[in-house]
Amino acid sequence: MSLRIGVIGTGAIGKEHINRITNKLSGAEIVAVTDVNQEAAQKVVEQYQLNATVYPNDDSLLADENVDAVLVTSWGPAHESSVLKAIKAQKYVFCEKPLATTAEGCMRIVEEEIKVGKRLVQVGFMRRYDSGYVQLKEALDNHVIGEPLMIHCAHRNPTVGDNYTTDMAVVDTLVHEIDVLHWLVNDDYESVQVIYPKKSKNALPHLKDPQIVVIETKGGIVINAEIYVNCKYGYDIQCEIVGEDGIIKLPEPSSISLRKEGRFSTDILMDWQRRFVAAYDVEIQDFIDSIQKKGEVSGPTAWDGYIAAVTTDACVKAQESGQKEKVELKEKPEFYQSFTTVQN
């Protein structure tokens, strides 16, 4: 029997997930949708020829007994409310980041899920499903390079929109590194510091770009993360981990190499969608399969969403203060201690 999914938010990412569930993945079907723009929601149903009900809001969608699980792909500030309602309705819920716009909001979700006593919430940190990051994780878990000491990483975009602000460099951009790095090294963060190099001529007047974020873990690992969102040349994600006995590096996306007219070259991707499209597919398929086979989700947890929120809050504070700031996490609840989110 197919998992019956409702989608809350039919914008760009919502449509992408509807398309992959309908046309690429197995074991699920879209049976309900809702969006603040009802006309847009209806158009999505028609575009993908869905046998789905268009609901006026998330309350009515979640009240549908034919909905087993929901995808929350709406505007970020609306996520917390929809996720809390889904938990109370005993629905499985996949929520794109952010889980909530504040650490307090994430903690409310954590507490509600603990009350239920069952893992219902998965957060959309798709890099854990990228084959390159999975290879890094396997190498670290197998101690191929000994204990990790330092991590050098970069998150570069060709350009960003006029509404992109300095704090978004960590809240919207670096948040992916924040999640995947603590997963890779299995260590919590201790402190963060933000350094502003010389400003790029490509950055808009209101935006400080590039930025370097220095993160220290409780175990002493030092991470330097470059964020450069106006690099012009492409969408470029880098990660190099220096261990006691060697170095491992995130592989480049697969691409043909060209030898022509005295040059040797390979293409660089220009957007995040192409870079991580396979990871999105694996991520949503895992959400479906875990529910069908285990009756619980197995991807990034609500607690992971809380860690990301606390860490980005500390980064924003460091942007403003220019000082090293503490990452002050609450004690991890026992409920989440037994869950692993390592992908195979």
UniProtKB/Swiss-Prot annotation:
Gene3D superfamilies: Dihydrodipicolinate Reductase, domain 2, NAD(P)-binding Rossmann-like Domain. It catalyses: myo-inositol + NAD(+) = scyllo-inosose + NADH + H(+); 1D-chiro-inositol + NAD(+) = scyllo-inosine + NADH + H(+). InterPro entries: Gfo-Idh-MocA_inositol_DH, Gfo/Idh/MocA-like_OxRdtase_C, Gfo/Idh/MocA-like_OxRdtase_N, MI/DCI_dehydrogenase, NAD(P)-bd_dom_sf. It is an enzyme of class 1 (oxidoreductase). Homotetramer. Involved in the oxidation of myo-inositol (MI) and D-chiro-inositol (DCI) to 2-keto-myo-inositol (2KMI or 2-inosose) and 1-keto-D-chiro-inositol (1KDCI), respectively. Can also use D-glucose and D-xylose, and shows a trace of activity with D-ribose and D-fructose. This is Inositol 2-dehydrogenase/D-chiro-inositol 3-dehydrogenase.
